[in-house]
Amino acid sequence: MAAVVRRMGPVWWGLTPALDLQMHLHPPPPPEIYCSCSDDLPELNILLVGGGDGRHILKTICQASRWPHRKLKFFIIESDLELLARHMLFLSLALEHPEQMGLQEKSELFLELFGNSLIRNKTASYLQEKSELFIRYVTDPDYQQSNVPLLNLSSIKFKERDKLEDIFKFWRNADPKLFPIDKYWDEKNRQNLGRRYDSRKGAYDWDLSMKLHDRGAGVINSREYNYWREKGVAFMNREGVYDIPNKTLASQMVVPQSSGKVLARGYWGDITASPYIAFGIETEEESLLQTANGVHVKSAQDIAQHNMISLFHELAYGKIYSVPASGQAESELAKTDSDYKTNEEQTVGLITLNNVEIHFLPRFNNFFNLLYFSCSMVHFLKPEYKFIAASKATLVLELTKFMVDLQTEKLQDYVTIVAKLAQEAGFTPTETIDWKTDYIAKFERAHDS
């Protein structure tokens, strides 16, 4: 497909914490560098190449009220259509009106679909019902625009729409045997660990303490990390049985077999870094980062849950979330414990975002104020990208700090490589890159490029 390239597995969750991209513009651009909208509201055009999970989009949208009023336009290029499908799912979930779904329920549902190999029955029902809606979105553009006008699918070709429809039909199918992810997870674990598989708990502990903890993700505790490494279940925020495969983690890839190369569906994503990096290791609520005797009091799950509640609160109400006093519970958090309403039962519309647009697969020149490349897609950063970057555009590159499988010297080498790629593409660093502490690197379009 156009602007979609195959690599070794999709990035279901990113390798760096979610960013409010407006915070990383360097320097904060004056209004005159923005493109002008018909309503004279300044635009900020953001290109995301290989963002994967939409975490940067979500955080930037949710925290937009903290910044001068402007129209945000996101342009998305992904390696796999399944990632675009997940973008649609998480965006739709984020926009569920608080009268329809409380913040607690929404946050738990998001994290469950985001980072769990296995989900609860009512979560699976929600996914099936949403899939029915998404099928109509990709097959009926007028219906999609009338319901979710901020999502622009006009650049997606008919062939790609057909493939998206097939993905959503697969999600809609309730048969758990179609995607035995517990089997796929174990097979990938065995392949990754090799002879260490029989002593895998020690391998898990080593990766956590000597890699993730040493690189700044100390809030992830061994209990949650080991359980995720073993089962693929990262978030269990409520009592329930997690036994239904999360089909949003399924993708197809060409694999070699005795009969030749075949297209196989399976789980081809991460099994070492964890979904905790995206939302669970940083927070504005400092009390969640407290330690006792050198051990974090709260877990990465606790932090992720708080962060999602905070983001969804800010999206719905336009103000920063405050933690309730001890012993108190805000009514907006716990809307209902019953099953989520089906599409037919919904009487409340989605949260309206008038000044946000999300486009898939763009092609523009001298246009983008901010460009983001994930570490899995940075090799596509070519000199030609300087022609689509606006004057003084910011380039943000994801680094490999939390990539467990890389040794120290590889982390250093990667920084050198991406700095050279950025320079060749016409960008200069805005600050010194420290491979030990930084998980992103920032550059600015050179004046003479």
Swiss-Prot record:
GO terms for biological process: axonemal dynein complex assembly; motile cilium assembly. This is Dynein axonemal assembly factor 3. Required for the assembly of axonemal inner and outer dynein arms. Involved in preassembly of dyneins into complexes before their transport into cilia. The gene is dnaaf3. Disulfide bonds: none annotated. GO terms for cellular component: dynein axonemal particle. The keyword Cytoplasm applies. It is found in: Cytoplasm; Dynein axonemal particle. The keyword Cytoplasm applies. The lineage of its organism: Eukaryota, Metazoa, Chordata, Craniata, Vertebrata. InterPro entries: DNAAF3 (IPR039304), DNAAF3_C (IPR028235), DUF4470 (IPR027974). Keywords: Cilium biogenesis/degradation, Cytoplasm. Pfam families: DUF4470, DUF4471. Its main location: cytoplasm. Belongs to the DNAAF3 family. Signal peptide: none annotated.
